[in-house]
Amino acid sequence: MMEKLIITAAICGAEVTKEHNPAVPYTVEEIAREAESAYKAGASIIHLHVREDDGTPTQDKERFRKCIEAIREKCPDVIIQPSTGGAVGMTDLERLQPTELHPEMATLDCGTCNFGGDEIFVNTENTIKNFGKILIERGVKPEIEVFDKGMIDYAIRYQKQGFIQKPMHFDFVLGVQMSASARDLVFMSESIPEGSTWTVAGVGRHQFQMAALAIVMGGHVRVGFEDNVYIDKGILAKSNGELVERVVRLAKELGREIATPDEARQILSLKK
């Protein structure tokens, strides 16, 4: 029998704006409301970027604190997973600020990626090792974000060097640097160490295709406005909750139960 399905909601990201979808949250209140919509629909993890009220991405620790407190009021047991990716161009010190709050999880990007145009999301070897070391020191479990197979190899190397601890949890972000096909997902899932867990974030039109594949393959799923603002072709999603609801329906139709936050903690070996 497969593990229950962990659904992560990436509710706002750093790149998508209200011009893409008016429901994208910026303010503390909007972020908390979107987190609640995803949580009530079945998400057990909130992947969190935060914004200033005008939509500018920020890694400010106090802004994260306010957003986390507001989310906790509405979703007391949800797992909150701050991003250490921040936004393109931020310094390492800026990106690490939310980990000072000692969340249960945070992301760890294991390589550099072209984001389109002149944007390069830079993660040098020294950056990755430093982030890994600090996450261990602060008791934060990394979700290892990988955009292609080479980043899995980097993560395995850094684990052997002591900068990442087992069991490892990966997030395959497909449809950016690497294509998003069934073959790609099988290849990625078979390339990680035994005993690891994984989730997939299909970007744009790939979101629900990748979700369906992950459900039947025994992986987990990330959806949300960060990766996709449409519920169907040409139809904007009204909320992150609507995106989560679609994954829940898929899972039920395919015979996969949904994990609660505490069940997700057990699957991911988290310490609450």
UniProtKB/Swiss-Prot annotation:
Family matches, as InterPro entries: Aldolase_TIM (IPR013785), BKACE (IPR008567)
Q: Which cofactor does it need?
A: Zn(2+)
Enzymatic reactions: (5S)-5-amino-3-oxohexanoate + acetyl-CoA = (3S)-3-aminobutanoyl-CoA + acetoacetate
| KW Metal-binding (keyword) present | yes
Q: Which GO terms describe its biological process?
A: L-lysine catabolic process to acetate
What does UniProt report on the pH dependence of this protein?
Optimum pH is 6.5-7.0. The half-maximal rate is observed at pH 5.2 and 8.1.
> Pfam families, per this entry?
BKACE
| Protein residues bound to Zn(2+) | H47, H49, E226
Q: Which residues form a coiled coil?
A: none
Where, by residue number, does (5S)-5-amino-3-oxohexanoate bind?
A: E15, S83, G86, T107
Q: What does this protein do?
A: Involved in the anaerobic fermentation of lysine. Catalyzes the reversible reaction between 3-keto-5-aminohexanoate (KAH) and acetyl-CoA to form 3-aminobutyryl-CoA and acetoacetate. The reaction involves the deprotonation of KAH, the nucleophilic addition onto acetyl-CoA and the intramolecular transfer of the CoA moiety. It can also use beta-alanyl-CoA as substrate.
Q: Assembly state and interactors? A: Homotetramer.
Q: What is this protein called?
A: 3-keto-5-aminohexanoate cleavage enzyme
Species the sequence originates in: Fusobacterium nucleatum subsp. nucleatum (strain ATCC 25586 / DSM 15643 / BCRC 10681 / CIP 101130 / JCM 8532 / KCTC 2640 / LMG 13131 / VPI 4355)
